[in-house]
Amino acid sequence: MEFNFEPSNEKDILKKYSRNLNEEVSANKLNKIIGREQEIRRVIEILSRKEKNNPVLIGEPGVGKTAIVEGFVQKIISKEVPENLVHCVVYEVNLSSLIAGTFLQGEFEKRLNALIKEAKQNNGAVILFIDEIHQLMGMGKAGNNSGMDAANILKPIMARGEIKIIGATTSNEYRQYIEKDGALERRFQKILVEEPTPEEALTIMRGLKEKWEIYHKVRIQDNALVASVKLSERYISDKYLPDKAIDLIDEAAAKIKTEAHTSPSEPINKKIFYLETEKIALSKEEGTNQKERINEIEIELEKLKQERDLVEKEWKEQKEQQVALNKIKKEIEKNNWDVERYQNQGEYTEASKILYSVLPELKKKLEAIEKSISENKKVLIKDYISEIDVAEIISRITKIPLNKIFEKEQDKLLNLFNNLKKRVKGQDEALKLVSDTVLKNRVGINNPNRPIGSFLFVGPTGVGKTEVAKSLAENLFNTEKAIVRINMSEYMEKHSISRLIGAPPGYIGYEQAGELSEQIRRKPYSVVLLDEIEKAHPDILNVLLQVLDEGTLKDNQGRNINFKNTIIIMTSNVGALYLMENKEDMFERELKTSFKPEFLNRIDEIIKFNSITMEFAKEIAQKMLDDLEKRLKDNNYQITFDKSVVEYVAKNGYSKEYGARPINRFIQKTIENFITESILKNELIKDRSTIINFANNKLAILKSN
C-alpha cells in the first residue's frame, strides 16, 4: 500500500485554516459594531506594546467578545488606529479545521508551525484571532507522554513578541484551563468584558436594526427594541445582554417573515375544499333536498372563488411592494457603505456623488413605496415588529400569559393589598405589612442588594400563611407556579444541607445541583416558601443568613445564585398557642429560644397571623363555595348557593384550633357529596339555573329557569 502526501502550499495556509476579517469588514459582511469603545481601545493599547502584546477577552457567553474584535477590525479599515496597526490584517483561526484529519503524529504540529511561519513573515502585520482559546490546551497531543500541544508551541513565540494573538474565552474556561498553566497565562493580558447595561444594550440593538430589517424584510419599531431589552432582562436569566435581546428580535422577525409567506387565501381554500367534497357526496344521491343544497353550494362556491382571487391578487401586489421596498433599502445600505469606504480612502469626489446625487434619489423612491404601502385599504402582509410580537416570544418561552406581561407594574402594585385581601380573609394587618415591604422595594427605598422581602410567618395552622405566598406569586410574578416550595422537615439532619445547595467536591452527587440553588437559578423571579422552618437543622439556617443579608448564595459549583428578585417566606408554628391566648411575652420568649438572634435580625418582618373568628369563617366559606360554583360552571352546571348554605358550612366547619382547613373538608364531605348524588339521580341538570339552600336541617334544591 502506497501513501502519497502532497505538501500544502504555505502561501495559502492562512486562507485554508482561517478567515480574513479585514476582507469581510471591507465587503460589509459583518455587522457594524456600536459601543464597546473602552474595550476596543484596550485591545489597541495591548497590541501596540513591544512585549506581552497578546490580549485575551474574558467574559460570559453572549456579552460581545467576538464583536469587540470585529470592532477593532473596523477601526483598522477606517484608519482610526496608531501607525503600527494601520496595515495589520486580522485572521480568525479555525481550530477545528486545523486539527481535522491529523491522524499521524507530527501532522498537526507541521500545520500549526506553517501557520505561524506565514504570520511571522509579514513582519507583525498579521494578527491571529483565536476564539475559544482555551482549546489550545491539550490540542494536538499524540499521547500522555507528549507535551507538544498547541499551547506549548505558541508559548516561546508569544514570549518573543514574534506573533500577535487575540484570544477570547469565558471566565470559567479561562480559570479551568489557562490559569493552570502559569507560563501561558503571563503571556496574555486580560481584558474583562462585562455584560452591557440595558441602556448600552439598547444602543447596540439600534445599531443592528438596519441589518435585521434588510435580512428579514420587515420594519422593526423602536418600541420592539426597547421591549426586547426590558423583557429579556426581566424574564431570561440564564443568558446575557445583548445576546438574549438579539435572540428575541431575531425570532420575532423570523416569525413575521414566515407569516408573510403564508397566503391569506388558505382559510378560503379550505372552505372551498369542504363545499366541493359535500357537493360530490350529494350528487351521488337523488332527491329534491339534495338538489336544492347543491344549488346553494354552487352559489357559495362562486362567491368564495371570487373572494379568493381578489385576496390573492391583493396579496401578490403587496408582496411585490415589499420586494421593491427591500431592494431600495439594500441599495441605500450599499451606497452608505461606499460613502464611508471612499471617505476612508480619501476619494471625496466619489463620496460626494453618492451622498448628494444617488442617495437623495433612492430616498425619494423609498418614500414613494412606503406611501403606496400605507395607502393599502386592507393590509394582508404584516411588515413590522412591535413590542407585542416580542412579548409573544417571551410568553412562548416563559409560559406567562401575554396580558400579564403587559400589565402595568404601577397598577399591579397599587392593587396588591386589595388583591391579597380577596384571597386571604381575616389577616388584614399581616397583608398590609407584606404589601408595604414589597412596595418599598419596588419603588427603590429598600436596599437593592437584598431580596424583595423576607418574612417569617407565625401563627396557628390553617390561617392562610401558605395562601399568602401563593397569592404573592400570582400577583407579582404573574403565575401561582412561580413559587419554590421546600418542606424544611426534610432537612432535619446536618448533612442534608448538601441537598439544598449541592454536595461539595469529592462527595457523591457533586455533579447534581442543589434543590434550592438550581430552582432559583432557573426561576429567579419567584416566591421562596420554606415551610415549617423550625424543623430544619440549625446549621441549615446559617446558610440562609447570606441570602437574607446579601441576596446571593454560592452553590457547590461556585456559582453565585441571585436571590435579589425573590420574596423569601418562612412559615412556623412556634409560639402559635401563645398567640391564640394573646400571650405576647411568652410568644417572644419561645421565638428567641427557637431561632438565633442573627437569624431573626436579618428578617424584614415577623408577621403574626390571627386565629380565624366566626365572622371570617363565613367569608372563607363564601369564597370556597364561590370556587365550587366556578368549577361546576365549567361543567355546565349553573348552581348558586343560598346564604343559608354559607351559614351552615361556617357553623359546622369552623374550628378555632385548626383554622380554615376543616371548612374545606366539611364542604367536600357534605356539599360536594350532595351535588354528586343529585347529578347521578338527574335532580341537577346541565344548563339549568339551580339554587341550593339549607332548610329543616337538610340541603335542598330549588329549581329555576
Swiss-Prot record:
GO biological process, one term: cellular response to heat
UniProt cross-references to InterPro entries, sorted A to Z: AAA+_ATPase, ATPase_AAA_core, Clp_ATPase_C, ClpA/B, ClpA/B_CS1, ClpA/B_CS2, ClpA/ClpB_AAA_lid, ClpA_ClpB
Residues that, per the record, bind ATP 1: G59, E60, P61, G62, V63, G64, K65, T66
Stretches the record annotates as NBD1: 12-195
Pfam families reported for this sequence: AAA, AAA_2, AAA_lid_9, ClpB_D2-small
GO CC terms in record: cytoplasm
Keywords: ATP-binding, Chaperone, Coiled coil, Cytoplasm, Nucleotide-binding, Repeat, Stress response
Coiled coil: 246-378
Molecular function in Gene Ontology: ATP binding; ATP hydrolysis activity
Residues reported in the UniProt entry to bind ATP 2: G459, P460, T461, G462, V463, G464, K465, T466
Region spans: C-terminal: 612-705
SMART domains: AAA, ClpB_D2-small
Assembly description: Homohexamer. The oligomerization is ATP-dependent.
Function: Part of a stress-induced multi-chaperone system, it is involved in the recovery of the cell from heat-induced damage, in cooperation with DnaK, DnaJ and GrpE. Acts before DnaK, in the processing of protein aggregates. Protein binding stimulates the ATPase activity; ATP hydrolysis unfolds the denatured protein aggregates, which probably helps expose new hydrophobic binding sites on the surface of ClpB-bound aggregates, contributing to the solubilization and refolding of denatured protein aggregates by DnaK.
Family to which the UniProt record says this protein belongs: Belongs to the ClpA/ClpB family.
PANTHER family, per the entry: ATP-DEPENDENT CLP PROTEASE, HEAT SHOCK PROTEIN 104
The protein's name: Chaperone protein ClpB
Annotated organism of origin: Malacoplasma penetrans (strain HF-2) (Mycoplasma penetrans)
